[in-house]
Amino acid sequence: MDFQNDFLTNPLRVTLYNPAENEYTKTFIFLGSVPANVLQACRKDLQRTPKDKEILQNFYGKDWEKKLSQYVVGGDSDDLDEFEKLFVEDSGEETNVMMPEIETMYSEYSIFPEDTFKDIREKIYVATGIPPYRQHIFFFQNNALQVTYRLLLSGSGVALDIRDYKKEFQQVGGLNIDASMESQKDELYVEALDSFQLIKNIHHIFVADLNTLVAPMRRQISIAMEDNYQFDLLYYGLIMKYWPLLSPDAFKLLVQSPLQMEKQYPALSPSLTSLKKRLLLEQKLINFTYARAQQVIAKYEGNRLTRGTLAVTSAMIKISPLVNIQINVRNVFDLFPATPDIPQLVVFFYSKTGPTVVSKHHITSTEPEKFSNKTFRVPTIILIRFINKKAFILTIQNNGHYFIESNWSENERHDFNSVVSTLNNFINPIIHTINDMGPAAFPRGGSLPLPSNEDIQISISSMSVSTFWPYTLSSKGFTELKSRWREYEQAGIISVRGLQQTGIYNFLFKKGIYSYDPHEIERMIIISSGPGRKMDINVALLQNTYAYLFDANVAARWETIYGGRNIRIYHRVTDIKIEMFNITQEEFNYLWVYLFVFLDNLITGPDKILVNKLSQLHDKQQGKGASQLRALQEQDPDLYDLRKYDTQATVYSVLCQHPRPPVIYSEAEVKSMPPAKRKELVKYWNFTEGVPAYYSCPHPDYPHLSLLEGRHPLNYCLPCCQKTKALLGTKRFYINNTCLTKHTFVEQDLEDLNTQTSRHTLSYGKKIPVNRIAFLPHQIADELFLNTIKEPDIFCIVGVEQTMLGISNAGLFYSLARILDLAPKALAIEIAKAANTPQYYILGNGAGNMFSSGAELANLILQTFVEQKNQLLQWDTTWQDIFLDLVAICYDLHCVFFKDKQGDIEFEVSPSTIQKILSPSKKIAIIFDTDEGIYPMAITQQKRFLKNSEAQYIFTEDDPVMEVVQSMSEFMCKDNWWDIHDVKNIPGYTVGKKLINRHNFCYALLIDSDTDRPIYFPIRLSSYIHDDIPIDFDLRPTQIASFEETWKFITLFNKQYKQYEIVPSAVLQNIKKEFVGFLSEGKTGLYFYYAPTQTLPATLEKLPIATLTIDPRDIDQAILYPLEEPYPQQNKANKAFYINHLYKFLLIEFFDVLYGLQSNSTRKHIENLFQKTDFQKITSVTEFYTKLSDFVDLNDIHTIKHILETTDAEHALKVLQKNIFNFDYTLLSPLQSYTYDELCQHLKKLLTPRIEFYEDIETIDRGLINIYTSCQYSTLNQPQCKKKRLRIPVNHFENYIHILAADILNPLKHSTLLLTGLGVIDDLQFILRPQEIISVKNKF
């Protein structure tokens, strides 16, 4: 990394310019801290001796004369406009012009590459005596004149060339003014850029001093200012245009009482004495940094960017395409579904009602309020994706620029490359999905480039980074560190705010920080003046962002936003940690040098701190408990921060209490130790860094290192010192050896160990290690299950895994795998197959409704339990209900639970399981759900289990245990108010089907008899079992038995089941006046339906009539099958709706044809110009832009210029071919030369190949055509398209051609026609999927 001050050998030249006389008056050259002989040789100027010239050449190089001369870059003022002029008109290749001989002054103040133009103003002040508010700075860059602010008039840039001052013919108070500025003063806006531009490679700037105009005319100006109109002409027509640092009041004071400026406006005119003192101190400190930079970089560079010494904890990557892309973010939002993987989306766009924010989220997530409440500047879509519990945020703007951001744990040690790689992997599938949307997302063609594409620029910003200085300080040393930063504060390099915490030094680094958003001050002011807040008029109506120099309210907000980057330095036991917040990668490299030069100076050089203030890393001793634990956590947080992986885990300080924690050393520390001390160390592993670590146990009472197993959530072994050494052949010896070799102790290790060493069964109530067994609680084993088994059999609970990556409560999953004797992944794969079913929604008593399809549910199961790439946290325990149902379906196994929460044991069983238990064929497993975890119950013999883990987990009707479970289930059976199978006891009738709802409950039976149609027999919602009776998930059938047949069955039923007698209470009649059923009274209160009849059955004559305005079956139909064929009336409405929008569809095809015809022609013209241009020669470039301006507008020229500046000419041509320009939209003008009849014939010729003619319109559903695109490129299923052509009835096409011709020839219709490119019929109509929740907000 290069870190040098180029301004030492190529100094900044500041030339004073007098606009009144249009002449340059004096040049100041900022030499900085050069050697004395160089300074002396410079100051001799015209009297330099050959020796002086030799000194200057040796220091500045062969071109020393040019560096110290008075060249001005650029041509005459007529040739260049601020930010606008793109080429010069002179024919020569050299654009440097020698100025007339003027006085040259030399300043010893240093200029640094990290100086902003705000800093430069202050240094000009101390060198020239011209205070900042009187300076109008301009300079030349890329042959264009530039200034340090932007003046906008009605949103458009105003050309700012002070050299045009004398061309203004209107005068007020003896000063030339631009009167047009005053007439539009309310539309003016000044954007201060001084703080957001570095001097960097600019070596010559010019300053126009306002005093050269004001001082000679002060009396005339004062008189003119007495008239408000003339004052406004002066202020807006001259001061705001060229010296915008002055407010109107400050300008008045400058004219009337200039000596009061320093007192009234200290930010505009700071104390010269104080400023000189501060700048000299700054110069001393920064020069020291540059002097030591290369040495420090060489010392630490090898480790600076490695994963061990750098940790990016948050970052934002900005992807900027080189080509113009128009993306319809509204359509992307509409077409992109919310899923458990991408559960939150937000879009901002301009709808027919104005600025609009729409958010949607999956039902497993919450509304993204944080993002929907943001202030947006341009149409934007935000997508939030979760991977392994981590949120990744993608923000896409309508110009194709997009941003990716996320956060990481410091322990993950992400460097810059891994951050980019991680974010790229996250973004690629989403970008592919959006690109597949075709013209619906990209109405003018193109696609979003991937981060790996060559046609983009990538920048990393908004980073939070931790880096580590590999030395440590004593408490006194850290206090000394803090005190040394005070000089930097006095120099203005940093600022310190608020109270400091013990062991942390917090400050803002200000110097050289410029990558801010200049518009953030506007947003903050809008927020601070928003609804419910008292509005400050001066702030709320901010017209000039230089107001921070003359308005205290704006200054406070400015300092909050642009006050520097937050830096925290942590005093740690093992090193010094530095955190940098919200920085760019460029700023990190810059700040790192400053910070490490400062820190290295603490231990090297003449100014190093005392030895007793340094902690000796190579001679660690057993410290106090807190510091020792902190040292371990600092060096290996992945190992010692147990709650990072499990919030319920016991912390290390409890597992290994003082003074038993060991001392950890790195390999570098071990190398510097004496050989005798190295022999005492035990080699282990650093899990955070992925490198060896070494441990010692210095406390005399606990000299032996041991490794604790089964405590860490990831099965890492935890070092802890013990009194005695583990003996050969013991359990502890086996565990220590396994841990030292493998670094972990897992289930298989435990099985091997148990086989060799375990001889006992655990007591109930303890956490059960994997493959260990524990006794049941005595009230279950000795009371409830008394006499159900014989010795030597015992009841036990078997230990299984309780956690996995992505889900913390995985005990049930592992219990089911153990019960079924399956590998966990094999179980997940099988039940995922079963989940991919059309009836997925019934799983978990309707929990499956959270998903849009069985495939989505199956995919999430595989991601979570097989690939372990996802997480089910937002399901809570719902996933368990789904798994239990899937196991029942796949293996015909049902589970009952004993839930022991805080010692209170309860028996729990689901209604569907009760049905199975009470049926003749049954197979169950018993599971214990305790505070320590979820474990399966088994019957085994202790010796047999220790030998081969053999046990019985599944119980059938032949097992005595089943009798106990069955009796308890009968007691809990409340939901089936009669047994479905008892219907078989009614002669002549059988149950033909069970009707099941979306929550997996049976709600009715279809009873078969000797008639053709089944009897509809409703029951109270009930669980059911899978038996020989078919089940049906469809709607209530329409073809059912008559009232007579239904009543005949009910009569027989009432005789057999008097306790459930069915008594009608009201007759049901539909809107057609047909009698369709009755409502029963009593315990049931159910709706009984029969075939519609016009005659009221005699049995029901005396009952009240209840009219059903809507049949409940129709409601169910609308919910379950929303896209079914609509009613005839709806068909007519949709047909009319379709006809009304056919003209819009035709316009889309028309413009698509025109874009291809005209833009291809223009591109060929540009390509020819490219091939004829030598971009190495200014004359050739000038000719290129001149010819280009003949057929493209200024905005397109800017775009082409930007592409040429950011890439080489050869590649630029490829970029241009993909780009979208304004000339792509200028389509209608060539057609206006036609007559009406000629145009009609021309349009027919253009459009007929795009049309599929037919006689009449078929049924069309409105929801499918809300988003429409050209049929030629559509990737959507659009009913108006067939074979990539637009379907239009023959009798309509001719009419549309005549309407289109009339619209083209009518200039008032141009804007209306071009607006059709949006491609949306109703921009506030969105696709609403079953698992999505959408909310809309207007942003006024």
From Swiss-Prot:
Keyword Glycosyltransferase recorded: no
Membrane-spanning residues: none
Superkingdom as given in the UniProt entry: Viruses
Protein's UniProt keywords contain Nucleotide-binding: no
Keyword vocabulary terms for this entry: Transcription, Transcription regulation, Virion
One Gene Ontology cellular component: virion component
Subcellular location as annotated: Virion
Primary location: virion
Record's function text: Putative initation factor.
Family: Belongs to the asfivirus G1340L family.
Protein name stated in the entry: Early transcription factor large subunit homolog
Biological source species: African swine fever virus (strain Badajoz 1971 Vero-adapted) (Ba71V)
